[in-house]
A protein has these predicted regions:
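Class I S-adenosyl-L-methionine
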Residues: 1-174, 182, 211, 215-216, ...
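Signature of N6-adenine DNA methyltransferases within the class I
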Residues: 1, 5, 11, 139-142, ...
């Protein structure tokens, strides 16, 4: 059974069990409780099952027979009815995996000569700081977790994988999202990985609820991200920023144009242009940013500030245009990274 079928079947079964009439579950909180209870039973050595007899696995390889974290991400779209309106489009797993690998490889190449020793690479990966400015349900934060652990496992074969998972969760990955409901899913996925790796107590929260474009004293840049920025910034910025045009969103753009980010704004712009500029500002010297975005920015007059910043403040390592390939089923237009 394909992952999509597992997701659809679980939705149908869960709704039926919860409501008796196929209706929607009352809240994401209820589903989270069911999943966490299942995880805790498994940790205690008991067989835990989800409504409808489904298994719950933290391993994405089990997606053909179980509900996995990526299936939970797909469920998010069913719970958040305003996802399209907010510009949120959830990223397919194959793209997340590829982007995570490309970003880490590009960063390592810029930091270390080739050939490089395993000890040097392991040391760098142990200290890397990664940021997703629009976490959503945690596709990229989980993708980076898996990729960093896989690479470090090859370089440090004597280190138990659970130790590597806990180290990456505690030290390497940060994220921000303005949507509290979406962030709850991302935090839950981190919490599952933490517990499955033998983590004790609460995991330090590096996934922050807030507006990535809020530069005020009460915003995330002056609060949860301030220590990293004081130390020079992030090594990697990765993600899928919200695609929101000016049409029908005048208040949102007017507020942005009156903020400290006004220099990144222009007419006929898209919201993600400013996200990209802020992401570049968050990078440490020698850092790498990898975003998936609509490809029209290369010729759109409204993206002039972004193009100028790219040319003056940094360099382009790679552009990958997907052409007519529909990366996102629910989003119009062509995309690139």
């Amino acid at each position: 059974m394909k992952e999509r079928n597992v997701q659809d079947c679980f939705i149908a079964q869960y709704f039926s069990v919860e409501k008796g009439n196929g209706g929607r579950p009352e809240t994401w909180e209820r589903l989270k409780e069911v999943l966490m209870d299942n995880l805790q039973k498994r940790q205690a050595g008991h067989e835990g099952r989800l409504p409808g007899g489904f298994a719950f696995s933290l391993r994405e390889e089990d997606a053909c027979r179980a509900v996995t974290p990526s299936v939970l991400e797909g469920l998010l779209g069913r719970f958040l009815t305003d996802a399209r309106r907010s510009g949120t489009v959830y990223t397919p797993g194959f793209l997340v995996r590829w982007m995570a690998r490309e970003a880490i490889s590009s960063w390592l190449e810029s930091r270390l000569p080739s050939p490089r020793s395993g000890d040097e690479e392991a040391g760098l990966l142990g200290s890397i700081r990664v940021l997703d400015l629009s976490v959503g349900a945690g596709a990229f934060t989980m993708g980076m977790l898996r990729e960093l652990v896989a690479r470090r496992k090859l370089l440090e074969p004597d280190c138990p994988e659970p130790d590597l998972i806990r180290a990456v969760l505690e030290e390497n990955i940060y994220g921000v999202d303005v949507c509290a409901e979406a962030l709850e899913v991302a935090r839950f996925r981190f919490r599952c990985a933490w517990l499955a790796a033998g983590g004790k107590g609460d995991l330090r929260d590096r996934l922050l609820c807030g507006d990535s474009l809020d530069m005020s004293a009460s915003g995330v840049w002056r609060q949860g991200l301030s220590t990293v920025m004081e130390e020079g910034g992030f090594d990697l910025v990765i993600g899928n920023p919200p695609f929101v045009g000016e049409k029908g969103n005048k208040e949102l753009f007017d507020r942005l144009k009156c903020s400290s980010l006004a220099s990144y704004c222009s007419s006929r712009m898209d919201y993600w242009y400013v996200f990209a500029c802020v992401g570049l500002d968050a990078l440490k010297r020698g850092g790498v940013m990898h975003l998936v975005v609509p490809n029209k920015w290369m010729s759109n007059a409204g993206a002039a500030s972004l193009r100028r910043k790219l040319l003056e403040d940094c360099g382009l390592l790679r552009l990958s245009d997907f052409g007519a390939c529909r990366v996102f089923e629910s989003a119009r237009g062509h995309t690139m990274t």
